[in-house]
């Protein structure tokens, strides 16, 4: 109780079971800035992978991954700005909140695309290249039908989609980068604690954003280091 009273201005009460948490003004600002500052680095990083691509398939993969990465931060930032400054536009806010949830599914699929597209995989793993996008489409349909109704189910879908391709990727003969992949996944999982702690921990959602940013950076590093050329090769080809 003393903790809540001390940080009352930085945190509101928990959301109802089928409702959405209402952040304080401080939390709104933190939610916006923690992802807004990552938009430009995401764009630059995506462009770098595209420039380092050797062939058409690598370029397509870099484009898919880059679009997912940039979309995550852009859509999240726009939603939090609308939620903060234009909350009276209920329909607009609701639409952007749905987009914010949907883009997570496509970001997960895009994050695995480089590993599934650019590494030699077995027959089962090759099917995962397409199945993961079917899961993303299924998640999108779920958001349309049951947005904010079954929060635990939604979280289960995110975690299932995050772990299912990992089981296939770990079966690759070339295991370079798997430690970084696992490390990033662990960071995402730890961040989920804060994702579900609005109204319990001040700035919980903004802290979740920082976990997402850190995990995404670890995964980007692994993709850049093990699936695309090194900076030395890049400079040599300029």
UniProtKB/Swiss-Prot annotation:
| Swiss-Prot/TrEMBL keywords | Endosome, Lysosome, Membrane, Receptor, Transmembrane, Transmembrane helix
Q: What spans does the record annotate as topological domain Cytoplasmic, numbered to this chain?
A: 1-28, 83-101, 145-151, 196-198
Q: Please name the InterPro entries in this protein's record.
A: AdipoR/HlyIII-related (IPR004254), Hy-lIII (IPR005744)
Compartments in which it is found:
Late endosome membrane; Lysosome membrane
> Membrane topology for this entry?
Multi-pass membrane protein
- Coiled coil start-end: none
Q: Name one GO molecular function term.
A: protein kinase activity
Q: Which GO terms describe its cellular component?
A: Golgi apparatus; late endosome membrane; lysosomal membrane
Residues on Lumenal side: 50-61, 123, 173-174, 220-238
Chief location: membrane
Q: Which residues cross the membrane?
A: 29-49, 62-82, 102-122, 124-144, 152-172, 175-195, 199-219
Biological processes annotated in GO: positive regulation of neuron differentiation; regulation of protein localization
Q: In which tissues is it expressed?
A: Preferentially expressed in the brain.
Q: List the Pfam families hit by this protein, alphabetically.
A: HlyIII (PF03006)
Described purpose of this protein according to its UniProt entry: Is involved in the dynamics of lysosomal membranes associated with microglial activation following brain lesion.
What is the similarity comment for this entry?
A: Belongs to the ADIPOR family.
NCBIfam families associated with the record = hlyIII
Recorded protein name is Monocyte to macrophage differentiation factor
Taxonomic lineage is: Eukaryota, Metazoa, Chordata, Craniata, Vertebrata
Gene name?
A: Mmd
């Amino acid at each position: 109780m003393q903790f809540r009273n001390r940080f009352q201005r930085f945190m509101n009460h928990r959301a109802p079971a089928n409702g959405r948490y209402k952040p304080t003004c401080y939390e709104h600002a933190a939610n916006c800035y923690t992802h807004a500052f990552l938009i430009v680095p995401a764009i630059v990083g995506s462009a770098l992978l595209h420039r380092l691509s050797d062939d058409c398939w690598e370029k397509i993969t870099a484009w898919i991954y880059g679009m997912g990465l940039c979309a995550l931060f852009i859509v999240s930032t726009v939603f939090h700005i609308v939620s903060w400054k234009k909350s009276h536009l209920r329909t607009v806010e609701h639409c952007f909140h749905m987009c914010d949830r949907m883009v997570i599914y496509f970001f997960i699929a895009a994050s695995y695309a480089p590993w599934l597209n650019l590494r030699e995989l077995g027959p089962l793993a090759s099917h995962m290249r397409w199945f993961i996008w079917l899961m993303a489409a299924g998640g999108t349909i779920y958001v349309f039908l049951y947005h904010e109704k079954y929060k635990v189910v939604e979280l289960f879908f995110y975690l299932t989609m995050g772990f299912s391709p990992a089981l296939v990727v770990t079966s690759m003969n070339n295991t370079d980068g798997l430690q970084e992949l696992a490390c990033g996944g662990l960071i995402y999982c730890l961040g989920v604690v804060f994702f579900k702690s609005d109204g319990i921990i001040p700035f919980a959602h903004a802290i979740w954003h920082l976990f997402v940013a850190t995990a995404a950076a670890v995964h980007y590093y692994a993709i850049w280091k093990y699936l695309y050329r090194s900076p030395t090769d890049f400079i040599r080809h300029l």
